[in-house]
């Protein structure tokens, strides 16, 4: 059976191989000087980390006391610690309240793995003995409702749907009403995912938030954005737009197993000061893992 650490290492291989091999090449029989530091900086930027994050890492890297003879493994160890520091803002866990309804608003663009992620989370919490409900608020896409229905059956979760093309906010409201009535522990609200630069979608999300607050002024408990790791630099735009509409509390990153742009996670966490709750490293339910910044940082540099 593959361990979590090994599965993460395997998932990050497209990014980590590039960084690891780059470091090996830069520091092969070379000293740490202005030239090698510049090469290292370019390598990290090419992995889709932001310029600001890389600049911070390089400045801290210069302060590390190395022996005269420096090798690539020593560099990787130092880098892993510095990347972990940059990810310190991601360390806030995904917490739920006991004895009350937790409302989780889940948003993201089409194709990011939003509905699948909800299904995995629903299955995970159902297996822990929680009563789970799912509100299908992507009412303009029949396929999304069907997909969510399959996941809800698998997770033994209550499914709340509306008529095709119904107002998504009305479905969210009814989802909360039913969840309160049936003493549900966790309600996941699946939302539409049309392109993030479409004003109508952002208005729709804002309306959902406004409507559910009528039943609970503290709702949603969490507003989570699901990001496809393959997206790369466009991730920054997505986070900014969805954050404006829903006041995000955290992130979930999917498809790390298919991405060569995993470095973008470091920049996004640092820029927006948002925790990264879960990462998707495969298609199975158990492949949605709680994010561990220590393991991620070490695997990212090939350790």
Curated annotation (Swiss-Prot):
Its EC number is 3.6.5.4. It is found in: Cell inner membrane; Cytoplasm. GO terms for molecular function: ATP hydrolysis activity; GTP binding; GTPase activity; signal recognition particle binding. Pfam families: SRP54, SRP54_N. GTP binds at residues 108-115, 190-194, 254-257. Gene3D superfamilies: P-loop containing nucleotide triphosphate hydrolases (3.40.50.300), Signal recognition particle SRP54, nucleotide-binding domain (1.20.120.140). It is an enzyme of class 3 (hydrolase). It catalyses: GTP + H2O = GDP + phosphate + H(+). It is a peripheral membrane protein. CDD domains: FtsY (cd17874). GO terms for biological process: SRP-dependent cotranslational protein targeting to membrane. One of its GO terms (cellular component) is plasma membrane. Keywords: Cell inner membrane, Cell membrane, Cytoplasm, GTP-binding, Hydrolase, Membrane, Nucleotide-binding, Receptor. SMART domains: AAA (SM00382), SRP54 (SM00962), SRP54_N (SM00963). HAMAP family: FtsY. Involved in targeting and insertion of nascent membrane proteins into the cytoplasmic membrane. Acts as a receptor for the complex formed by the signal recognition particle (SRP) and the ribosome-nascent chain (RNC). Interaction with SRP-RNC leads to the transfer of the RNC complex to the Sec translocase for insertion into the membrane, the hydrolysis of GTP by both Ffh and FtsY, and the dissociation of the SRP-FtsY complex into the individual components. Part of the signal recognition particle protein translocation system, which is composed of SRP and FtsY. SRP is a ribonucleoprotein composed of Ffh and a 4.5S RNA molecule. PANTHER family: SIGNAL RECOGNITION PARTICLE RECEPTOR SUBUNIT ALPHA. Belongs to the GTP-binding SRP family. FtsY subfamily. This is Signal recognition particle receptor FtsY. It comes from Rickettsia conorii (strain ATCC VR-613 / Malish 7). The lineage of its organism: Bacteria, Pseudomonadati, Pseudomonadota, Alphaproteobacteria, Rickettsiales.
């Amino acid at each position: 059976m593959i361990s979590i650490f090994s599965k993460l290492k395997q998932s990050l291989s497209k990014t980590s191989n590039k960084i690891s091999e780059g470091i090996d090449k830069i520091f092969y029989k070379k000293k740490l000087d202005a030239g090698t530091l510049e090469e290292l900086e370019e390598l990290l930027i090419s992995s889709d980390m932001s310029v600001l994050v890389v600049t911070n890492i390089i400045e801290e890297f210069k302060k590390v006391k190395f022996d005269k003879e420096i090798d690539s493994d020593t560099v990787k160890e130092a880098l892993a610690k510095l990347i972990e520091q940059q990810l310190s803002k991601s360390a806030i866990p995904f917490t739920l309240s006991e004895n009350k309804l937790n409302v989780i608003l889940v948003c993201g663009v089409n194709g990011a793995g939003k509905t699948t992620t909800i299904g995995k989370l629903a299955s995970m919490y159902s297996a822990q003995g929680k009563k789970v409900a799912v509100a299908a608020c992507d009412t303009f896409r029949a396929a999304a409702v069907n997909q969510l229905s399959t996941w809800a059956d698998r997770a033994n979760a209550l499914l709340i749907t509306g008529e095709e093309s119904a107002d998504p906010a009305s479905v969210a409201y009814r989802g909360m009403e039913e969840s309160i009535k049936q003493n549900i522990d966790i309600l996941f609200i699946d939302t539409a995912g049309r392109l993030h630069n479409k004003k109508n979608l952002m208005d729709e999300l804002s309306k959902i938030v406004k409507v559910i607050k009528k039943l609970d002024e503290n709702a949603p408990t969490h507003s989570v954005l699901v990001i496809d790791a393959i997206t790369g630099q466009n991730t920054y735009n997505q986070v900014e737009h969805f954050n404006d509409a829903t006041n995000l509390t955290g992130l979930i990153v999917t498809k790390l197993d298919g991405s060569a742009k995993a470095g973008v996670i470091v920049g996004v966490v640092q820029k927006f000061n948002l925790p990264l709750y879960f990462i998707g490293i495969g298609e199975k339910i158990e492949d949605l893992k709680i994010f561990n910044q220590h393991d991620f940082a070490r695997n990212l540099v090939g350790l």
